[in-house]
């Protein structure tokens, strides 16, 4: 297993500077991570710097609340891809899920999948805000909507991935959809637990520390 190619090297803090973006790009190139995951404002720059590097550009849509309109999420997706994004991590409408408005949740995801035009779409369900049945339902809706991954967390809601949630999500979606664990994966031990539970992608700001087998002190 090439552990580096499971990692989306992530910097999503609102105060992120160009210097910090340069740093994670340089690290991603050095370690040959799967992608760099940045906010949409940094996508074009990251795409230019990562051109022909083999490292993908991942960005986030409706982030971190998931509470923007479906049309807004679709436009954000189209704009991001036009600017060079390879992968899209979107946040579901969490309130709609809790209301039982499952058609709205699925249509929201479907609109982003359509706007992504074949690019990889990962669906963040924010597990820390959901109970067991809601995690199952959100995972089912993600699969039904045609997304590629179901993802645990934004890292902004006070909790992150757990091995138990990852396993539940993977058991729900089966072989057709992959699972991304993010939030609180800070070291090699955390990384291995998530992979053993069924994750095939890890979102973390601690990619370098994971590769070096060291502890990191970041929440995402």
From Swiss-Prot:
A biological process from GO: carbohydrate catabolic process
Keyword Cytoplasm attributed: yes
Classification via Pfam families: DeoC
Pathway noted in the entry: Carbohydrate degradation; 2-deoxy-D-ribose 1-phosphate degradation; D-glyceraldehyde 3-phosphate and acetaldehyde from 2-deoxy-alpha-D-ribose 1-phosphate: step 2/2
Gene Ontology CC annotations of this record: cytoplasm
Protein name from the UniProt record: Deoxyribose-phosphate aldolase 2
Assigned keywords, A-Z: Cytoplasm, Lyase, Schiff base
Described purpose of this protein according to its UniProt entry: Catalyzes a reversible aldol reaction between acetaldehyde and D-glyceraldehyde 3-phosphate to generate 2-deoxy-D-ribose 5-phosphate.
EC assignment: 4.1.2.4
Residues making up the signal peptide according to the UniProt record: none
Catalytic activity, reaction form: 2-deoxy-D-ribose 5-phosphate = D-glyceraldehyde 3-phosphate + acetaldehyde
Domain of life: Bacteria
SMART domains on file: DeoC
Main location: cytoplasm
Record-linked SUPFAM superfamilies: Aldolase
Leading EC class: lyase
Active-site feature positions: 89, 151, 180
Subcellular location(s) per record: Cytoplasm
Gene3D superfamilies: Aldolase class I (3.20.20.70)
Phylogenetic classification of the source organism: Bacteria, Bacillati, Bacillota, Bacilli, Bacillales
């Amino acid at each position: 297993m090439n552990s580096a190619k499971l990692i989306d090297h992530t910097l999503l803090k609102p105060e992120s500077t160009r210097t910090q973006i340069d740093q994670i790009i340089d690290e991603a190139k050095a370690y040959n991570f799967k992608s760099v995951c940045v906010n949409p404002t940094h996508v074009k720059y990251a795409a230019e710097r990562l051109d022909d590097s083999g490292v993908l550009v991942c960005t986030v849509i409706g982030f971190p609340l998931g509470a923007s309109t479906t049309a807004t999420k679709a436009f954000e997706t189209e704009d991001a891809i036009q600017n060079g994004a390879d992968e899209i991590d979107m946040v579901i409408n969490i309130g709609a899920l809790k209301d039982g408005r499952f058609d709205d949740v699925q249509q929201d995801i479907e609109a982003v999948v359509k706007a992504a035009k074949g690019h990889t779409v990962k669906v963040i369900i924010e597990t820390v805000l959901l109970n067991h049945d809601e995690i199952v339902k959100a995972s089912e809706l993600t699969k039904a909507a045609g997304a590629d991954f179901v993802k645990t967390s934004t890292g902004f809601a006070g909790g992150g991935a757990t091995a138990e949630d990852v396993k539940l999500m993977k058991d729900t979606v089966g072989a057709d959809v992959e699972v991304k664990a993010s939030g609180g994966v800070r070291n090699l031990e955390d990384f291995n637990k998530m992979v053993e539970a069924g994750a095939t992608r890890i979102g973390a700001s601690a990619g370098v520390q994971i590769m070096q087998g060291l502890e990191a002190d970041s929440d995402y």
